[in-house]
Design a protein with these regions (language model features):
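Class II aminoacyl-tRNA synthetase-like tRNA-binding/catalytic domains
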Residues: 1-85, 95, 178, 282
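Metal-assisted phosphate- and nucleotidyl-transfer catalytic regions
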Residues: 15, 96-222, 226, 241-267
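Internal, well-ordered alpha/beta segment that forms a basic, Gly-enriched binding/recognition surface
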Residues: 42-49, 58, 79-124
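Short, glycine-/Ser/Thr-/acidic-enriched flexible segments
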Residues: 23, 37-39, 57-59, 78-81, ...
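Active-site pocket scaffolds in enzymes
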Residues: 232-302
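Short conserved micro-motifs at the rims of enzyme active sites and ligand-binding pockets
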Residues: 43-44, 64-65, 200-202, 226-228
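A residue-level signal for conserved active-site and pocket-lining positions in enzyme catalytic cores
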Residues: 32, 47, 76, 126, ...
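Hydrophobic (often cysteine-bearing) scaffold residues that line and stabilize catalytic clefts
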Residues: 32, 36, 86-90, 165, ...
């Protein structure tokens, strides 16, 4: 269902709110989903093992060459399989798109041969290689991030006293890391910091990192995947921390979906991934803007 009681609980993820009015005339706050993730994990908890969704999703405050407020997401899950399985799925689908289009993936002046074996690069290694930052030195042994330790390594990159560790991490990622990814071949950026785990489980034996990855071509993020977290209490703590930050930053917070959290406790080990379908089409056709591959782009203000 596209209407949800909670659209997702990430600090910088913005949803479209709607009012659902019942037969009694009483309104109820609902949201257009930003991803089918919550609904699909409820299905995993109910016993489904291999599922996918190919649907429109909505995200507010997103507009640009690579962003549309409404876009198409392909999301799928494999119960009982490691997250490397959905990595392989994703690469195979991107390769199929390139083969069908009959040309390398391209965006602006960048090219990517999807038929070549992908590069699998750890986030820690990427920060060292492309930004000269020792990311592991910015974590406590339990994975707690130290904003001052990261601030001391970012050099001339813009920073403010209000920035969190996650703010600085994202700024380095976008400005110094992402432009170097997916050049010539697909890059799988793997093993994200636990502080950026979202809904991913921690890496076994290394609590500072998580089973989260993103797939890039031509410097563009195409997909985001997890080895899925099934610890209800841990997920609740993460959601509350994210909503506290959202409240501090934007003055709003979204409710928690208690049915979803209860489903996590029953969900089997699984891996899952969400792919931005329109971005794949963009790169396969060489389109410069996402609006060029949407059947009916969201209209601009007159």
């Amino acid at each position: 269902a596209a209407l949800q009681i909670s659209p997702g609980n990430e600090a910088h993820l913005h949803a479209f709110g709607v009012e659902a009015i019942g037969n009694d005339g009483v309104g109820r706050q609902m949201y257009l989903h930003t991803s089918p993730e919550f609904a699909m994990k409820k299905l995993l908890a109910a016993g489904e093992t291999r599922i996918y969704s190919f649907a429109h999703v909505w995200r507010n405050r997103e507009r640009g060459a690579l962003h549309s407020p409404e876009f198409t997401m392909l999301e799928w899950y494999r119960a009982g399989e490691p997250y490397a399985a959905v990595m392989d799925d994703c690469v195979a689908l991107i390769r199929l798109a390139a083969e069908t289009a009959g040309s390398p993936l391209r965006y602006r002046d960048r090219f990517c041969d999807a038929c070549l074996p992908p590069e699998r690069l750890g986030v820690v290694e990427a920060f060292d290689r492309h930004a000269g930052i020792d990311l592991m030195a910015t974590f406590a042994p339990d994975g707690t991030p130290d904003v001052d330790a990261l601030r001391s390594q970012i050099g001339p990159l813009r920073a403010t006293d209000d920035d969190t560790w996650s703010d600085l991490f994202a700024r380095v990622l976008v400005t110094r890391i992402e432009p170097n990814l997916g050049q010539g071949r697909i890059t799988i950026l793997d093993r994200y910091p636990a502080a950026e785990a979202a809904l991913a489980r921690r890496l076994p034996g290394e609590p500072r990192l998580a089973e989260r990855f993103e797939v890039y071509a031509c410097g563009v993020e195409l997909a985001n995947g997890f080895g899925e977290l099934t610890d209800m209490d841990e997920q609740r703590r993460r959601f509350i921390a994210e909503m506290d930050e959202k409240q501090r930053r934007y003055g709003v917070r979204y409710p928690l979906d208690e049915d979803f959290l209860a489903a996590l406790a029953r969900m089997p080990p699984a891996s899952g991934i969400a792919m931005g379908f329109d971005r794949v089409v963009m790169l396969a056709t060489g389109a410069p803007r996402i609006d060029d591959v949407l059947w009916v782009p969201v209209g601009e203000r007159p």
